[in-house]
């Protein structure tokens, strides 16, 4: 034997003392559930896989074809990309809106994305608006005139809404995956359909290029900025988006400039203590968000290193002064 610690006695034990049991499950959602329940000694299923299994079970029988399509679309996605959508954005925003801690997304948090089954739930008043939206979107898209005009009506998802179980869950995740991909990283600077001011472009270009941007703490701060921007866009769209970029830049990166080091707790505390996400949730116009007062920094406040490019932006925007 090439490995002396694995000898003939071990082989004999495997051949004569061990058994292999095979389970065959024809339902994919049952397979996910069974695997997770039997896998306590191995690697857990990802939270988004558990959510997939849960929401597949929530499909009504008459949507079998749509269920198969949802499975196909989901499985065409890269698992790490789905994990990023949930862990970095959807989970954190939904928690911060309610002033709750949002460190790491785990299987213990999947209840956050379980909502109401419109085909089974009691007709409580709170479900009525969801039923109207759900049925109206389907009625519009299934009308014979759509064959002529080729129009479609997307469901009006909101980041902080009650989740509609089943098909709408999969549509919601696809919607936000596309939105995240269009608003984060370098994507927004290339969106010709979203005109931005020179200042907003300058900010985004700086965030995408300053030398220290790949440090762990700087990544956390970029996540703060991106989450605030995503939540704002989800509610107000392009309206005063350039001003929002300026506001969220100062709000997020003040935390970076005034900290020697940024940890996940630093990011989380800043998001919750500032109440920005709660402000966006309650606002009925962009003006209320943009009126958020922010501190002007001085040299005594600066603790971070290698941030000269961003300090210059703060100074140009009158949020940094050499002396008061």
Predicted feature locations:
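Flexible coil/loop and intrinsically disordered segments
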Residues: 1-324
């Amino acid at each position: 034997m090439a490995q002396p610690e694995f000898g003939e006695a071990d082989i004999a034990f495997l051949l004569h003392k061990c058994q292999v049991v095979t389970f065959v499950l024809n339902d994919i959602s049952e397979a996910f559930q069974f695997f997770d329940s039997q896998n306590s000694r191995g690697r857990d299923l990802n939270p988004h896989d558990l959510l997939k299994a849960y929401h597949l079970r929530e499909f009504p029988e008459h949507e079998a074809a749509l269920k198969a399509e949802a499975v196909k679309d989901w499985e065409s996605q890269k698992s790490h990309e789905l994990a990023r959508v949930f862990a970095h954005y959807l989970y954190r925003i939904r928690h911060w809106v309610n002033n709750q801690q949002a460190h790491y997304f785990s299987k213990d948090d999947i209840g956050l994305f379980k909502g109401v089954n419109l085909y089974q739930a009691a007709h409580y008043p709170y479900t009525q608006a969801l039923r109207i939206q759900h049925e109206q979107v389907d009625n519009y898209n299934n009308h014979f005139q759509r064959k002529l005009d080729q129009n479609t009506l997307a469901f009006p998802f909101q980041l902080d809404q009650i989740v509609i179980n089943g098909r709408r869950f999969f549509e919601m995740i696809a919607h936000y995956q596309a939105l995240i991909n269009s608003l984060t990283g370098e994507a927004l600077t290339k969106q010709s359909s979203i005109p931005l001011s020179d200042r907003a472009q300058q900010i985004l270009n700086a965030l995408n290029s300053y030398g220290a941007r790949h440090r762990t703490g700087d990544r956390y701060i970029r996540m703060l900025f991106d989450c605030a921007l995503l939540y704002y866009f989800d509610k107000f769209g392009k309206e005063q988006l350039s001003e929002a970029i300026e506001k969220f830049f100062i709000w997020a990166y003040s935390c970076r400039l005034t900290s020697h080091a940024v940890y996940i707790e630093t990011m989380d505390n800043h998001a919750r203590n500032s109440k920005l996400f709660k402000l966006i949730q309650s606002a009925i116009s962009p003006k209320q968000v943009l009126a958020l007062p922010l501190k002007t920094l001085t040299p005594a406040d600066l603790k971070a290193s290698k941030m000269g490019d961003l300090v210059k932006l703060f100074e140009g925007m009158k949020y940094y002064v050499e002396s008061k």
